[in-house]
């Protein structure tokens, strides 16, 4: 059976959405709170049910309770094809082709439907064989037994991989047999048109799925006499950023006139021994850093202040630090210098101990976190830590709270403070994400990195002969290696710099820089050729326009332009590039002439140096053995022969006795 064209289009659209859905993942701070809306779509493409809440991603999995008649409204296969999900009534006129006792148009039909079981089959996450066996939309993905993964039937269909479970969220009636009796009994219990609610819960696999933003589709079929009828439903997650209304719309009930901030005036202090607070001539607001409004009548609608420039923001930052320092430590602001660092990091965090607030519902402050995680490279002090603190960061913790509890709670930092986590800077923490991950957070105060110096520090830089402590000097690679290519080796002989220039690594550095400059030259040459081609096209257009305005004296006369000519300076660029290429060739020849006949081997392949270094020692040892091995072996054999001869003589002497010798002339002389 060929499915309708609308079903084929919906199947293709859902397939494409499921394919890209796994790639849609919000990046940035995982504690960021969004407005999450779980929506259920019917087969006609309408949103029949939804629930909304403010939560962090992957933390809110509510039970979805749509009504079956909402999903069946508008379908030709049921008895309310002319109804929408929002205008269902107690009794509705059914269609003539749907005269079965089960349906949604009458209370007794709804009662009869509650006696039946239903089963659910998924469309997504199936392999090709299962999809072929279970069918498509026309069979509600349940064309064969065994395709069902959930439902509320007597055989209890289940699965280990499906994303949801669907059960009935109503009580099954005792009996709905007699129509007259049904009319009387069901007048009270089934008069509500939404009396067939379902309960959809998420499984562990569903909580790990990444395609909820594009949605997943299921087919639900009732176990009825004859052909099992059913519906198609789709579950989708909508993610929105929490917004706040700003504007002069007086229709809004909570519209309030913004308060215009002004600088608080410090009351005069009585003369005491303590130093007074230094006066500050400022027209800046300590909260916003914008100029204070001039006195006068207030405009009918609030006006937005102009955004200050970069210089104004930096000056406001320094002045805000001075105001704070002047108020807290007046002794330190008598004569000082505040210097804003010109290199990162621009902010520092100071760990503190404070009392955080536990919220059941996410406050508005939790939605103001930056999208991208901000990293603090300098955090000092001792403060409050939450989570699994690694050993490298335990020195920042004066008090550690390994676990606050379980549940969908949100921990907000006190006003003026932040949580700095391994995922970034945030004013709010989702407790569920903190417990499920290896995240950790530290309570900090955020301060701009501004150096404080006394007056003597600055004066010492300008007064001749002044003595002051020197700051550490930062040396770059250019300062460390400068002068090696110019032949000034005398200064580096004592530190072994002379050996550095002779190494192959330094020559490779020169070759790498040479290749980089050559690539730059090729890019400029390509740009020059493109410019020539463009100029040719422009000149062709110019000649064409001159022909069109020939009666007016040409294009320049028609435009009344005094200077109307083209100056081609690409020849200068071409000559410069030719000279640069010539210098490249000379430098390449110089590199090749300085290399020995064996040094060129190392430049042929990157692994040749490692191979030769690894095989050199065994080859040298083998060569020495072949050269001196025979001589050493001969001496060793000769030494062994001598030792064996001595041992053989000793063995022979043990088998004989020495005879007595006597002189025949002197028989009495016996030796």
UniProtKB/Swiss-Prot annotation:
Biased composition (Polar residues): 271-286
GO cellular component: host cell plasma membrane; membrane; viral envelope; virion membrane
Annotated spans, Disordered: 265-310
Residue ranges crossing the lipid bilayer per the database entry: 612-632
Record topological domains on the Cytoplasmic side: 633-671
Extracellular side: 23-611
InterPro entries: FMuLV_rcpt-bd, TLV/ENV_coat_polyprotein
Keyword set, alphabetical order: Cleavage on pair of basic residues, Coiled coil, Disulfide bond, Fusion of virus membrane with host cell membrane, Fusion of virus membrane with host membrane, Glycoprotein, Host cell membrane, Host membrane, Host-virus interaction, Lipoprotein, Membrane, Palmitate, Signal, Transmembrane, Transmembrane helix, Viral attachment to host cell, Viral envelope protein, Viral penetration into host cytoplasm, Virion, Virus entry into host cell
Covalent S-S links between cysteines: 121-142, 134-147
Signal sequence coordinates: 1-22
Organism the protein comes from: Feline endogenous virus ECE1
Top-level taxonomy: Viruses, Riboviria, Pararnavirae, Artverviricota, Revtraviricetes
Feature: compositional bias, Pro residues: 292-305
Residues of this chain annotated as glycosylated in UniProt: 169, 281, 326, 331, 355, 358, 415, 435
Function: The surface protein (SU) attaches the virus to the host cell by binding to its receptor. This interaction triggers the refolding of the transmembrane protein (TM) and is thought to activate its fusogenic potential by unmasking its fusion peptide. Fusion occurs at the host cell plasma membrane.
UniProt protein name: Envelope glycoprotein
Motif (CXXC): 336-339
GO biological process: one example: symbiont entry into host cell
Location of region: Fusion peptide: 473-493
Renumbered residue ranges of the record's region Immunosuppression: 539-555
Gene: env
Domain notes: The 17 amino acids long immunosuppressive region is present in many retroviral envelope proteins. Synthetic peptides derived from this relatively conserved sequence inhibit immune function in vitro and in vivo.
Site positions per UniProt: Cleavage: 470-471, 650-651
Post-translational modification comment from the UniProt entry: Specific enzymatic cleavages in vivo yield mature proteins. Envelope glycoproteins are synthesized as an inactive precursor that is N-glycosylated and processed likely by host cell furin or by a furin-like protease in the Golgi to yield the mature SU and TM proteins. The cleavage site between SU and TM requires the minimal sequence [KR]-X-[KR]-R. The R-peptide is released from the C-terminus of the cytoplasmic tail of the TM protein upon particle formation as a result of proteolytic cleavage by the viral protease. Cleavage of this peptide is required for TM to become fusogenic.
Coiled coil start-end: 501-550, 560-596
Chain location of the short sequence motif CX6CC per the record: 556-564
Keyword RNA-binding part of the UniProt annotation: no
């Amino acid at each position: 059976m060929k499915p309708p064209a609308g079903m084929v289009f919906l199947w293709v659209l859902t397939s494409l959405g499921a394919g890209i859905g796994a790639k849609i993942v919000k990046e940035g701070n995982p504690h960021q709170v969004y407005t999450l809306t779980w929506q259920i779509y019917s087969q006609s493409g309408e949103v029949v049910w939804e629930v909304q809440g403010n939560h962090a991603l992957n933390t809110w999995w509510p039970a979805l309770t749509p009504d079956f008649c909402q999903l069946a409204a508008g379908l030709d296969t049921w008895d309310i094809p002319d109804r929408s999900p929002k205008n269902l009534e107690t009794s509705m006129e059914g269609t003539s082709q749907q005269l079965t006792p089960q349906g949604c148009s009458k209370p007794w039909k709804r009662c009869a439907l509650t006696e039946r079981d239903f089963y659910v089959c998924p469309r997504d996450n199936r392999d090709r064989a299962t999809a072929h066996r279970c069918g498509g939309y026309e069979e509600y993905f349940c064309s064969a037994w065994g395709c069902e993964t959930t439902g509320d039937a007597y055989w209890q269909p289940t699965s280990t991989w499906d994303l949801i479970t669907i059960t009935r969220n109503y009580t099954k009636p005792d009996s709905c047999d007699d129509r007259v009796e049904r009319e009387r009994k069901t007048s009270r219990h089934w008069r509500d048109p939404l009396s067939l609610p379902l309960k959809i819960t998420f499984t562990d696999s569903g909580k790990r799925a990444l395609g909820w933003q594009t949605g997943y589709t299921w087919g639900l079929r009732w176990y009825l006499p004859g052909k099992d009828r059913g519906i198609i439903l789709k579950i989708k997650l909508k993610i929105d950023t929490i917004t706040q209304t700003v504007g002069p719309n007086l229709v809004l009930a909570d519209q309030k006139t913004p308060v215009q901030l002004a600088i608080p005036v410090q009351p005069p202090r009585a003369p005491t021994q303590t130093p007074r607070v230094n006066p500050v001539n400022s027209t800046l607001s300590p909260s916003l850093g914008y100029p204070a409004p001039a006195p006068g009548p207030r405009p009918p609608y609030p006006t937005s202040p102009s955004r200050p420039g970069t210089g104004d923001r930096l000056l406001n930052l320094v002045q805000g630090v001075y105001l704070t320092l002047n108020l807290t430590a007046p002794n330190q602001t008598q004569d000082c210098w505040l210097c804003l660092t010109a290199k990162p990091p621009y902010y520092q965090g100071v760990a503190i101990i404070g009392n955080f607030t536990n919220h059941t519902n996410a406050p508005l402050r939790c939605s103001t976190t930056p999208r991208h995680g901000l990293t603090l490279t300098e955090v000092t002090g001792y403060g409050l830590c939450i989570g699994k603190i690694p050993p490298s960061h335990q020195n920042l913790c004066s008090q550690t709270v390994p676990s606050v509890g379980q549940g969908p709670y949100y921990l907000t930092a006190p006003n003026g403070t932040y949580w700095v986590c391994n995922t970034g800077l945030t004013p709010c923490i989702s407790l569920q994400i903190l417990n499920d991950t290896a995240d950790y957070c530290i309570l900090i105060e955020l301060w701009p990195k501004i150096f404080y110096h006394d007056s003597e520090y600055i004066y010492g830089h300008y007064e001749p002969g002044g003595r002051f402590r020197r700051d550490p000097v930062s040396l770059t690679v250019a300062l460390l290696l400068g002068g090696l290519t110019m032949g000034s080796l005398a200064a580096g002989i004592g530190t072994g710099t002379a050996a550095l220039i002779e190494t192959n690594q330094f020559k490779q550095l020169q070759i790498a820089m040479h290749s980089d400059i050559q690539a730059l030259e090729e890019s400029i040459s390509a740009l020059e050729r493109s410019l020539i081609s463009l100029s040719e096209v422009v000149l062709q257009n110019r000649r064409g326009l001159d022909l069109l305005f020939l009666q007016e004296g040409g294009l320049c006369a028609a435009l009344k332009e005094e200077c109307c000519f083209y100056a081609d300076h690409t020849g200068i660029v071409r000559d410069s590039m030719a000279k640069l290429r010539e210098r490249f060739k000379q430098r390449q020849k110089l590199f090749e002439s300085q290399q020995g006949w064996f040094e060129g081997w190392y430049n042929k392949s990157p692994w040749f140096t490692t191979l030769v270094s690894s095989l050199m020692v065994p080859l040298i040892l083998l060569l020495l053995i072949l050269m001196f091995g025979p001589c050493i072996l001969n001496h060793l054999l000769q030494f062994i022969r001598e030792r064996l001869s001595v041992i053989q003589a000793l063995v022979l002497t043990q088998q004989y006795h020495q005879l007595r010798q006597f002189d025949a002339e002197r028989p009495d002389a016996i030796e």
